[in-house]
Amino acid sequence: MENEDGYMTLSFKNRCKSKQKSKDFSLYPQYYCLLLIFGCIVILIFIMTGIDLKFWHKKMDFSQNVNVSSLSGHNYLCPNDWLLNEGKCYWFSTSFKTWKESQRDCTQLQAHLLVIQNLDELEFIQNSLKPGHFGWIGLYVTFQGNLWMWIDEHFLVPELFSVIGPTDDRSCAVITGNWVYSEDCSSTFKGICQRDAILTHNGTSGV
């Protein structure tokens, strides 16, 4: 009986240990699932934080150190180092380049050389130019008829201003604080870029 009892006791203990070990292993899948879920949550938080920081960085690029103008209940924003006026942004280059090179630089900034629409805009640009400084604008002479044309393919309205100097099919226009002059397009001057301002309404970007 002792051997039999001893055998039964040992067998019972082994069965208990086996059940306990099996129970312990059965908890591992749940543990790993919880760990996986927690890891996914942490990764998601990092991703959302990165998106949020990127959004605010982009927003700061257009809102920090710039003027904000309100027109008809809307706000207009320009990138850093651009001037804001009547829903448009203006950038005055610091590099001397040809007319075509200046236009190419403006295009890379998602803009174009200045196109003056009215006398108010003309006055704003001339007041913004430093004394003695010249700037390329988006005005050139056509190959036919020696007519002045803007880069948006509209002809210059004589009532807006007159271009001073001789003209030919290689002429482009530069502006100063007082006048607009005809110059050879291969000459080098600083360019004036123009683009539409970013429209916002009630603090929400329109783009």
Curated annotation (Swiss-Prot):
The keyword Lyase does not apply. GO terms for molecular function: carbohydrate binding; protein homodimerization activity. Keywords: Cell membrane, Disulfide bond, Glycoprotein, Lectin, Membrane, Phosphoprotein, Receptor, Signal-anchor, Transmembrane, Transmembrane helix. N-glycosylated. Glycans are attached at N67, N202. Pfam families: Lectin_C. The modification Phosphotyrosine is found at Y7. It comes from the Eukaryota. Residues 52-207 are extracellular. Residues 85-194 form the C-type lectin domain. Residues 1-30 are cytoplasmic. GO terms for cellular component: plasma membrane. Disulfide bonds join C78-C89, C106-C193, C172-C185. Signal peptide: none annotated. The chain crosses the membrane at residues 31-51. PANTHER family: KILLER CELL LECTIN-LIKE RECEPTOR SUBFAMILY F MEMBER 2 (PTHR46746:SF6). Homodimer; non-disulfide-linked. Interacts with CLEC2A. C-type lectin-like receptor involved in natural killer cell mediated cytotoxicity and cytokine secretion in keratinocytes via its interaction with CLEC2A. Triggers degranulation in a SYK-dependent manner and stimulates SYK phosphotyrosinylation without recruiting SYK directly. This is Killer cell lectin-like receptor subfamily F member 2. It comes from Homo sapiens.
